[in-house]
Amino acid sequence: MAFRTLDDIGDVKGKRVLVREDLNVPMDGDRVTDDTRLRAAIPTVNELAEKGAKVLILAHFGRPKGQPNPEMSLARIKDALAGVLGRPVHFINDIKGEAAAKAVDALNPGAVALLENTRFYAGEEKNDPALAAEVAKLGDFYVNDAFSAAHRAHVSTEGLAHKLPAFAGRAMQKELEALEAALGKPTHPVAAVVGGAKVSTKLDVLTNLVSKVDHLIIGGGMANTFLAAQGVDVGKSLCEHELKDTVKGIFAAAEKTGCKIHLPSDVVVAKEFKANPPIRTIPVSDVAADEMILDVGPKAVAALTEVLKASKTLVWNGPLGAFEIEPFDKATVALAKEAAALTKAGSLISVAGGGDTVAALNHAGVAKDFSFVSTAGGAFLEWMEGKELPGVKALEA
């Protein structure tokens, strides 16, 4: 897809640029506990400020449901944002109206201002064109730098793109280019790892992927449902037995498209789900009635390693086992390290996303070695489902 970036925006000196960022950060009291999202804003905000623009940051924080709520005011993160950006940040306690316009006029070229929480206004989440028109009066240009909110058609993520010349910020650009390389126009063979507890939450992802990838690696609790559909007794493992027919449909679709589905040949089982219980590593055919599958076994990991070695592109969403409890993190860590090594060697483009996935890659210590790790959550999942994202669609040139 073609979209305009900051390279296309032209001279912004003295111009007012409304920039949508994702600043929805976790807090403990008045302390930001994870500033990843604040840091993602640095390239776009500082580039525009250095070019002399008046940078007006729009963002949401929490779920105030269309009502002002001091607990969710963006004033609370102004100082943390200033610290990350390395420059002063003004605060304007509105997103529209005369007082906000006067505050914007008073800013010097190159200044950065954080506007109030967009979700304090009922029209934001309804994508109200009247609110979009009011907010647009504050700006000359609109930049969307928040891929993580791109699956929402809100005023600040979609509506403004129809009221002002619209561009993708640097973080948005980086995300879109990485996703295009992973599934849009990838280098084949393409492998996808899809894990997590339930098939039901990733049905659309699986259906989309069988038509796009050469190898589909199934892990986590959802692998149990796939195994059960093939007649394997999975004991008391987490399993959606009622979805066996649906899974058979996915197998049939994969056969038509030539996509090979990989399921574990051996597994790690325990009788209870807790840290370091007695475990057995066994072929999938040997699971006892009182045992549950909690990780993929070493033979399966070795086979999957060969799949990655033969692939050129990898898309990863979801862990292979119950990685949050040792020792059921071993398969995820081993395969993640292999993917990272192949990426560093230049033989694999690796793109990963989703909350559990990011946590698993950080746990394995390899997130920095993947080609791209998306922190976008819902937007990343909808992209994997093949859905059109309103915030991205609105930026198309």
UniProtKB/Swiss-Prot annotation:
Q: Does the keyword Phosphoprotein apply?
A: no
Top EC category = transferase
The record's subcellular location field reads:
Cytoplasm
Example of a GO MF term: ADP binding
GO CC terms: cytosol
Provide the alphabetized UniProt keywords. Answer: ATP-binding, Cytoplasm, Glycolysis, Kinase, Nucleotide-binding, Transferase
Q: Which GO terms describe its biological process?
A: gluconeogenesis; glycolytic process
- What is the reaction catalyzed? (2R)-3-phosphoglycerate + ATP = (2R)-3-phospho-glyceroyl phosphate + ADP
Which Pfam families does this UniProt record tie to the protein?
Answer: PGK
Supply the EC number(s). Answer: 2.7.2.3
Q: Which cysteines are joined by disulfide bonds?
A: none
Assembly and partners? Monomer.
* Entries under PANTHER family matching the protein: PHOSPHOGLYCERATE KINASE, PHOSPHOGLYCERATE KINASE 1, CHLOROPLASTIC-RELATED
Its protein name is Phosphoglycerate kinase
- State the organism named in the record: Zymomonas mobilis subsp. mobilis (strain ATCC 31821 / ZM4 / CP4)
Its gene? Answer: pgk
